[in-house]
């Protein structure tokens, strides 16, 4: 267990919580700049830790909400940053509706690698409450979220996130600026939920995406025929692999399959491989 010293405090980084504390002061300021937050916004920080990002946010915001699960770090932040509203709890369990009562939330955070996916999908599920999310996550995951068709990184995570959010990969962060030093690099991404959901049946779409990418090397026909009536989909389309289709094209295919299921397959689906 690695003990991290900051000012008057020695706190052991807890491996089970995936704690890696950011030591560099310039990176948090860059994260805040990229987030675009301004005074008056409803800002929520996930896991302030020793307050590197907290301090940078306070240069812009006189007060905001931070959610910290670790009891020792929650106590530290109450003492070090009394102007913030500190919620000592797990972000995955905190109700977001009350926090967004005054406006949509701008979420920032240095996210533990071990719970990146649960946090991302919690934000996605609550996208109607979110103005933006600017997050530092594992570099490999950031690449997968921002991936484009035809690349090895492009898959379920990219499609599910990009279908409902505008996603931007901002910059890479080397592992040397953390203590304890992680085994991998990090990166900062920004996600902004789309003003209008392009898919009404979001749960059905998630299931569809998991199915089309279940076996990446198989064609759409082979991945879908067990679950959907594909009779109204042009044969050239069914010969494609999911990894070759853009997010809008996959949304169009899903919509067409739902029309076919309802017996309303008017018109033919026109899908083109991304060049």
From Swiss-Prot:
Source superkingdom: Bacteria
PANTHER family assigned: DIMETHYLADENOSINE TRANSFERASE (PTHR11727), DIMETHYLADENOSINE TRANSFERASE-RELATED (PTHR11727:SF7)
Enzyme Commission code: 2.1.1.182
Name of the protein in its database record: Ribosomal RNA small subunit methyltransferase A
Keyword Transferase: yes
Residue sites binding S-adenosyl-L-methionine per the record: 20, 22, 47, 68, 90, 110
Keyword Transferase among record annotations: yes
Alphabetical UniProt keywords: Cytoplasm, Methyltransferase, RNA-binding, rRNA processing, S-adenosyl-L-methionine, Transferase
SMART domains according to UniProt: rADc
Primary location recorded for the protein, binned into one broad class: cytoplasm
Function: Specifically dimethylates two adjacent adenosines (A1518 and A1519) in the loop of a conserved hairpin near the 3'-end of 16S rRNA in the 30S particle. May play a critical role in biogenesis of 30S subunits.
Gene expressing this chain: rsmA
GO molecular function: 16S rRNA (adenine(1518)-N(6)/adenine(1519)-N(6))-dimethyltransferase activity; RNA binding
Subcellular location: Cytoplasm
Gene3D superfamilies membership: Ribosomal RNA adenine dimethylase-like, domain 2, Vaccinia Virus protein VP39
Membership in a protein family: Belongs to the class I-like SAM-binding methyltransferase superfamily. rRNA adenine N(6)-methyltransferase family. RsmA subfamily.
Pfam families named among the record's database cross-references: RrnaAD
Reaction(s) the record says it catalyses: adenosine(1518)/adenosine(1519) in 16S rRNA + 4 S-adenosyl-L-methionine = N(6)-dimethyladenosine(1518)/N(6)-dimethyladenosine(1519) in 16S rRNA + 4 S-adenosyl-L-homocysteine + 4 H(+)
One GO cellular component term noted in the UniProt record for this chain: cytosol
Primary enzyme class: transferase
């Amino acid at each position: 267990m690695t003990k991290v010293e900051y000012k008057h405090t020695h706190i052991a980084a807890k491996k089970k919580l995936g704690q890696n504390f950011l030591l560099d002061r310039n990176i948090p300021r860059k994260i805040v700049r990229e987030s675009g937050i301004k005074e008056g916004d409803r800002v929520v920080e996930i896991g302030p830790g020793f307050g590197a990002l907290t301090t940078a946010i306070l240069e812009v915001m006189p007060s905001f909400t931070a959610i910290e699960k670790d009891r020792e770090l929650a106590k530290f932040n109450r003492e070090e940053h009394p102007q913030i509203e500190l919620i000592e709890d797990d972000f995955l369990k905190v109700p977001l509706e009350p926090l967004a009562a005054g406006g949509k939330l701008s979420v920032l955070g240095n996210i533990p690698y071990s719970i990146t996916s649960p946090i991302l999908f919690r934000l996605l599920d609550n996208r109607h409450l979110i103005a933006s999310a600017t997050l530092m996550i594992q570099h490999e995951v950031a690449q997968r979220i921002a991936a484009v068709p035809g690349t090895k990184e492009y898959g379920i995570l990219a499609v599910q996130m990009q279908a409902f959010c505008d996603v931007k990969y901002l910059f890479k962060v080397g592992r040397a600026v953390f203590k304890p030093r992680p085994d991998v690099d990090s990166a900062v991404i920004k996600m902004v939920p789309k003003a209008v959901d392009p898919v009404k049946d979001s749960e059905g779409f998630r299931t569809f995406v998991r199915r089309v990418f279940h076996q990446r090397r198989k064609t759409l026909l082979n991945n879908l025929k067990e679950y959907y009536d594909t009779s109204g989909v042009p044969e050239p389309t069914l010969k494609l692999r999911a990894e070759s289709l853009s997010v809008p094209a996959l949304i169009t295919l899903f919509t067409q399959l739902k029309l076919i299921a309802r017996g309303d397959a008017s018109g033919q689906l026109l899908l083109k491989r991304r060049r």
